Each structure stands twice: as structure tokens, then as C-alpha cells.
Amino acid sequence: MATTNQLIRKGRKVLKEKSGVPALQACPQRRGVCTRVYTTTPKKPNSAMRKVCRVRLTSGYEVSSYIGGEGHNLQEHSVVLIRGGRVKDLPGVRYHTVRGALDCAGVKDRKQGRSKYGAKKPKA
């Protein structure tokens, strides 16, 4: 515990908050090019084949980004838009690809929660 005199001399050190998405560099989204598209398995209690892509961003970073929704059309050299948001059961995956933007198509036949998957409203 600091004494009153020590606080007068030096003051308290302000802790800086570390960003959870450093590659975005304070931008809401970033554009990038897929360098690898692959599937990986999640951490212990869960079991699945999660779709992930490695993306080289315009900011110079290379990051792993999760591809949400059922089915996708991404391959190497696809241009994608990524946003922040980690995937809890995939270590090292701190970004999501934005569906329905640039080369990433929206999810087909999506009826509910469409805006999150870039799906257009179906004709009545």
C-alpha cells in the first residue's frame, strides 16, 4: 500500500485496456484475402468440424477467421470482410467473416436471423 507522500510524488499508474481484436486497428471491419480455407475441431467438451479461413488483412496482419452458417463458397484468394468476435471453443480464432459481403455469399434458405448471415428476405 502506498503512503500519502508516495502518491503525491508519483501518483497511481493508469492501466491500459488491451484490445481483443488488435488486427482491426480500431476499425469496425477489415478487408482481406483468404490464404487458406480449412476445418478444425473445437476444444474438449464439444465435437464438430468448424469452418475457418486464414486471412491476410489490408492492415498487414494474418489472422484466423470463423465462417458462420451452413455451407460457404470461400476458397483461396477469395476477398472477405472480417469483424471482431471470438469463437470460444476454437483457440486463436478471434474474428468472424461477414456473410453476404464481398466474395462471401450469404447462407442459402435462411429464414430466421437472416441479417447475421447475409440472407435476403424470401419472396412470399
UniProtKB/Swiss-Prot annotation:
NCBIfam families: rpsL_bact
Family matches, as Pfam families: Ribosom_S12_S23 (PF00164)
Organism: Psychrobacter sp. (strain PRwf-1)
Annotated protein name in UniProt: Small ribosomal subunit protein uS12
Any one cellular-component term (Gene Ontology): small ribosomal subunit
Assembly, per entry: Part of the 30S ribosomal subunit. Contacts proteins S8 and S17. May interact with IF1 in the 30S initiation complex.
Function, as annotated: With S4 and S5 plays an important role in translational accuracy.
3-methylthioaspartic acid: residues carrying this PTM: 89
GO molecular function: rRNA binding; structural constituent of ribosome; tRNA binding
GO biological process, one term: translation
Family: Belongs to the universal ribosomal protein uS12 family.
Keyword annotations: Methylation, Ribonucleoprotein, Ribosomal protein, RNA-binding, rRNA-binding, tRNA-binding
